[in-house]
């Protein structure tokens, strides 16, 4: 039953085989349903819900009064099926104690009224999701919705049968044995062909009944996503529907039934349920849901018979599918797709058999969070573990090979390309789900989660690229995700997310002080249905990559009537557009930074692109920049923390290996102090950066402005000093190609200029601090 779904798409005209005497119904309700006849002039309208046809369900409206009617289906029925009197009884009991169900109003056993028994309940308005992926909501909301479902199930299973006055609602102990027996008989009565897997599964279930087959709880029997109505705006369950299969039995049967989608065979469509994939961000793992359920019920999360309940659930689903097809053959099933059920009985039974042979650990792995001020999400913890393992097993061992490729191709046409090992590593990372981790809407990770991952990837110069988390692509993908049109996303964001192309960002200019972004002179002028771009850019990172296909350009769409912060816009410029001229690569302390596609000077000479390439709108450039730079600065700073950890490791290794003046280097007090100061500095900037990430998670970019500015100053300064000490400890080797320290120093020193020089951030911090102090002073006065 699906009452309460918003919109008219869930309703249709009453099917011919389900039509009944509406006048007879109206006369009965006028007599027996209080308030129904209050609006005498109003006409009774009846529509049928497209879903919920096992027991046909109808939407009734008379004036301002709305109700839901549920009845038995017509025709020959399987024994003990479609007992709507039980539905009414259990809903009445649950409603009386405040459990979320539609209010049951009236039950009619007189079959002369509309041809079968029926009952009336209230119409509940809310959200019903039929797709397991719950599209259209954020990963955080999707996760919260799933948690709410499991908490509601735990609440149901915690109810006392006696207090509900439902003694006798079920037979008692031995539920699992009865289920195997009942569904075996139901299947055999409806079978249209011999399916050995059903017989084998039935026999296995009967031989492997759980020892505790004496639990007696109220269970739903068909607990799934589309039997839930959520609050229109909140992640809260306001009604559980379809109590046709409810009884007294073992609670784990409900939990297993809800968990079916984790193992659903790929060859079988989940009719009206969408499709589940481990990549569906925000959907908790099965172990997480079990942990929540068990915690709510106060029971141990180790479930020794979990494979039995999963196998039983698939056995029941196969039996139900066979019953649906049987009714189709008899002409009693109104569902348009009921004929499809003939082909899914066997794969469901085979899946049940496979699960019967598996052993499950339903307990979540314990991850030590002691001492963490900024706690990760469970998914963040799991991904971080996988990233650390991937770094250790695959990325760091490839560092020498990647470095040698660029040394050998320094003067070659291939110097802007990537060694083959990078493509192999990318394929491996994508296969393990370690892809696009920086984008919360795609990865389902928080800023704190990704900050700690960024620290790990900062330990190797090419690691971010392996996970498709390399600047400037990350910032450009964030721009397109947050501000791009659907057309822009399809054309550019999707291939960027797949890693098929790369991009560059063109903001800084050689002829103006770009630390004041309002100085930007590159012009973007509207001409009919196009924009024409003219200007010079430099430090356009990534432009030398052969896969770089698109640039995001910041320029002036001047309107003197607007403030100076609303005179700039961002526009998409394909790199092969006539007039785009790549002038030269710029070196950084002598490095051309080949791996990252270099840093280029680019000229735009009468470059014409469609007006649809403008992002968000004219004058929105700085607004977009702030959205782009906030997360990017956190990523940069946490990568420098990882870089600092690597530099400190090198420093300590060298200090323990080398002897000078008859003692190890670490025994010299100055070196020991460098080591100590390095550890102190790393811990300080890590905490400050994690605080900024936490502020972004909780307050957004605007609320984290001060913290982001502080880390942008503190992290590069501190890490530059740490790398400098490491170089000093390593001596001449520290500035050679035998160590990554010289490159590390170049990277960290540049960060004191990139994304705004220290002095600009310091001025901003001072302004914000003075404003905050003034507010406190005013409050005291």
Swiss-Prot record:
E.C. no: 1.3.8.-
Protein name as it appears in the record: Acyl-CoA dehydrogenase family member 11
Lineage: Eukaryota, Metazoa, Chordata, Craniata, Vertebrata
SUBUNIT field: Homodimer.
Required cofactor(s): FAD
Keywords, comma-separated and alphabetical: Acetylation, FAD, Fatty acid metabolism, Flavoprotein, Lipid metabolism, Membrane, Mitochondrion, Oxidoreductase, Peroxisome, Phosphoprotein
Modified residues (N6-acetyllysine): 177
Annotated organism of origin: Pongo abelii
GO molecular function list: flavin adenine dinucleotide binding; long-chain fatty acyl-CoA dehydrogenase activity; medium-chain fatty acyl-CoA dehydrogenase activity; very-long-chain fatty acyl-CoA dehydrogenase activity
Membrane spanning stretches: none
Known role: Acyl-CoA dehydrogenase, that exhibits maximal activity towards saturated C22-CoA. Probably participates in beta-oxydation and energy production but could also play a role in the metabolism of specific fatty acids to control fatty acids composition of cellular lipids in brain.
Class of this enzyme: oxidoreductase
Catalyzed reaction equations: a 2,3-saturated acyl-CoA + oxidized [electron-transfer flavoprotein] + H(+) = a (2E)-enoyl-CoA + reduced [electron-transfer flavoprotein]; docosanoyl-CoA + oxidized [electron-transfer flavoprotein] + H(+) = (2E)-docosenoyl-CoA + reduced [electron-transfer flavoprotein]; tetracosanoyl-CoA + oxidized [electron-transfer flavoprotein] + H(+) = (2E)-tetracosenoyl-CoA + reduced [electron-transfer flavoprotein]; eicosanoyl-CoA + oxidized [electron-transfer flavoprotein] + H(+) = (2E)-eicosenoyl-CoA + reduced [electron-transfer flavoprotein]
Residues engaged in binding FAD: 505-515, 539-541, 658, 728-732, 757-759
Residues that, per the record, bind substrate: 515, 630-633, 756
Cellular localisation: Peroxisome; Mitochondrion membrane
Domain of life: Eukaryota
PANTHER family in UniProt: ACYL-COA DEHYDROGENASE FAMILY MEMBER 11 (PTHR48083:SF13), MEDIUM-CHAIN SPECIFIC ACYL-COA DEHYDROGENASE, MITOCHONDRIAL-RELATED (PTHR48083)
CDD domains: ACAD10_11_N-like (cd05154), ACAD_FadE2 (cd01155)
